[in-house]
A protein has these predicted regions:
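Low-acidity, Ser/Thr- and Arg-rich intrinsically disordered low-complexity segments
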Residues: 2-22, 28-32
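Charged low-complexity "KEKE/polyampholyte" interaction tracts
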Residues: 242, 250-355
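Short, positively charged and aromatic/hydrophobic N-terminal segments
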Residues: 15, 24-26, 41-45, 50-54
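A contiguous catalytic/ligand-binding core that recognizes phosphate-bearing ligands
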Residues: 148-246
Length: 355
């Protein structure tokens, strides 16, 4: 592809292939005084130094449609959540994610493109340099486009993304374990001194039967955040003693809570992972939370949920089958999140440099 043909008919991908070396290079407007000039002057970056590797052009009509579709999809969760919050009627499953993970509803509502998408935008005629909801903190705008700019990352933010990426890679490379059968929710109410969700749901079994099950079944919870809510009397019964420091070594891809956490890590990786991946992770987390609570000792009949009775062999088989199904859905989301983080971290140096 020649530079002349590129200028005449812009490609959806801002890349050119060098025939002599076969390498991918990026064509990019030269920077002048913090802004991109007209496309008559270009620099070609080497493979090692290229900004994005491949940057996809998103025409205004395309990304506007994506944003509208995303907002409609997110509204299925955020509108009812706001209504329940205003009425003081929390849902033990659907509202848990907004309480356990303290991210605003607006984070789901607002569409952000994510790394590698170069969105058309006429800042000269628009009322603002960037579209509504697109933060100047992490995005760069030109006269004609805007994009998520990893050059705006601070060292602290880069280190946080690096840690998240390392954790996700460690989990992805580990064999799944499906032998826990959701005992963590039972261990949390062992002894009856503290029942976490008693404000929204009552227990479906007598305390003595709950305690007997916890004390008679093997508990092998590998998730730090779940384990830390165990009743003090149940913690010694767990085969593992996970800590914040050991989570990279212990968390595994079969774990309901580790897979639910994909929403948390995606939220922490915003705007780099993009809103569509964030919402994909959230929707999976809703299903995981549903499994979590249906297998718990709580009575959710008021909320239209049928219990998975893990106190029985049939219930444990049912739980394991559902756990495996959801873990298979979590795996590609984890890989997408890892890919977005790797791409961001690979190009975290500022794009607006001297050449």
């Amino acid at each position: 592809m020649s530079l002349t043909s590129y200028l005449a008919a812009p490609s959806r991908v801002l890349t050119m292939r060098l025939s002599a070396r076969g390498g991918i290079v990026t064509v990019w407007p030269r920077v002048s005084q913090g802004k991109f000039c007209h496309c008559s002057k270009f620099v070609i970056l080497s493979r090692r130094d290229d900004f994005y590797g491949r940057m996809t052009l998103a025409p205004l009509i395309d990304w506007k449609r994506r944003a509208a579709d995303h907002q409609a999809r997110a509204a299925r969760y955020t509108v009812p959540a706001r209504s329940r919050r205003d009425r003081g009627l929390p849902h033990p499953i659907e509202d848990f994610l907004f309480q356990y993970y303290p991210y605003p509803l607006a984070l789901l509502d607002t569409w952000q493109p994510g790394i590698g998408l170069h969105c058309e935008w006429d800042s000269k005629t628009a009322p603002s340099p960037l579209p509504h909801g697109i933060s100047e903190r992490y995005h760069t705008g030109t006269d004609t486009h805007f994009f998520a700019d990893p050059g705006r990352l601070t060292v602290k933010e880069r280190d946080r993304l690096q840690w998240i990426c390392g954790l996700l890679e460690a989990i992805a490379n580990r064999a799944p374990n499906f032998a826990c059968h959701g005992m963590h929710e039972w261990a949390m109410v062992h002894g009856g001194k503290e029942v976490r969700h008693e404000g929204t749901a009552r227990l479906r079994l007598p305390q003595s039967e709950i305690d007997d099950l916890v004390e008679s079944r093997p508990i092998c919870c590998s998730h730090h955040d779940a384990f830390r809510f165990f009743a003090a009397t149940a913690k010694p019964l767990n085969r593992l003693q996970p800590t914040l420091e050991s989570r990279v070594m212990l968390e595994q891809p079969g774990c309901v809570h580790a897979n639910m956490d994909l929403y948390k890590w995606a939220a922490k990786a915003m705007p780099w992972c993009g809103s569509e991946l964030l919402l994909d992770c959230f929707e999976l987390a809703v299903q995981l939370r549903d499994l979590d609570m249906r297998a718990s000792p709580y009575d959710l009949s008021e909320w239209g949920r049928t219990p998975i009775r893990i106190e029985t062999p049939d219930g444990r088989r049912c739980y394991e089958a559902e756990q495996k199904r959801l873990a298979s859905m979590a795996s590609p989301l984890r890989e997408r999140l890892i890919a977005a983080l790797r791409q961001t971290l690979a190009h975290h140096t500022p794009c607006q440099r001297s050449f």
